[in-house]
Design a protein with these regions (language model features):
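Hydrophobic alpha-helical transmembrane segments in multi-pass membrane proteins
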Residues: 29-46, 60-120
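Membrane-interface extramembranous regions at the lipid-water interface
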Residues: 2-63, 122-143
């Protein structure tokens, strides 16, 4: 069983907790988001005692999974719509509109996912535990 050490940083008077990986827990929590599911899984398996790091690792895996499923669903919908609506010249205009809307939805999902990813890394580094609606519920079940 790994022991956690509490050190007081004299400059900021903040207690730092070292995780089982040898990193401060806030650094380990932030790094668990770095490569999504992969780093989330690594930190989730390494950290057995530190609930802060385990939650961020689990939420990283869940968030990555939810975003991945959303991309796959959007790709399937786009492929089906393109196949159906571009099959004849009478639906070409509607197909073009639907294609543009799906492209905008994909762009919003990509930029939104990136913004949430950066937000989660920053907040974990600050020692906070933001809860993303679907991902946090899944993370709680994994804990």
């Amino acid at each position: 069983m790994a022991s956690t050490t509490h050190e007081i940083d004299e400059e900021s008077a903040v207690a730092t907790v070292e995780s089982e990986s040898g990193l401060d827990e806030n650094v380990a929590g932030a790094l668990s988001y770095l490569f999504g599911f992969v780093t989330g899984l690594i930190f989730f398996l390494i950290e057995k005692e530190n609930d802060f790091v385990r939650f961020h690792a689990a939420q990283s895996m869940a968030f990555s999974g939810v975003v991945f499923v959303a991309y796959i669903a959007l790709s399937i919908v786009g492929t089906v719509m393109t196949t159906v609506l571009f099959s004849s010249t009478s639906t070409f205009f509607v197909g073009s509109i639907v294609s543009m809307v799906l492209g905008l939805v994909w762009l919003v999902l990509a930029l939104g996912g990136f913004a949430v990813w950066i937000y989660l890394m920053i907040r974990a580094y600050q020692g906070k535990t933001p809860r993303i609606p679907i991902a946090a519920g899944i993370a709680d079940k994994l804990m």
